Amino acid sequence: MNRIILIGNGFDLAHNLPTKYEDFINWYWGNIARRFYFNLSNVYTDCLCSLKIKRSTWGEFAYNNYSILHPRPYHEYIKDIMNDKENFEVQLTPFLQNICQSIATKGWVDIENEYYYLLNQCTFSPLPFEYKDLNEQLSFIQTQLVEYLSSICIFRRIPVQHFR
């Protein structure tokens, strides 16, 4: 089993770049919310999760719940949706559950560790998913992470006065 060890020097965080996994997961939830918002569908599915609005479309939901128009982290919207079982049906894979749980409880996540933990679980005990599913999910996350990191704007103008 191959493992990758990443050693960071903190340069990105020292310059307030949103490069933590928590930032990435918030971006992921934001993509889902934006897809719903501009879509007439009431279902979203990928290999990590499935979200369904039971009674209306996302546009109707956003219109009737003005709080969604007030900016706040997307993971807060998703948390509200997960808690509203009357109007929403949410299914997360164990991998995404572990990632979100780690962020919620510790304020950070090590995605590679979560993957490795579940991979060991697949090997040593019967689970409702196979290692192939887990590998597909990790590959999806990697693809999404590349897209996310490519979208981060690192060039910004800093006024000269800032350096005086």
Role assignments for model-derived ranges:
Residues N2-D12:
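Short, hydrophobic/glycine-enriched beta-strand segments
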Residues N2, N16, D133, Q137:
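Conserved aromatic-histidine-acidic binding/catalytic patches
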Residues D23, A33-R164:
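Active-site periphery "cap/insert" segments of enzyme catalytic domains
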Residues D12-P18:
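Short N-terminal binding/cap micro-motifs at the start of the first secondary-structure element
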Residues P18-Y28:
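Short secondary-structure boundary/capping segments
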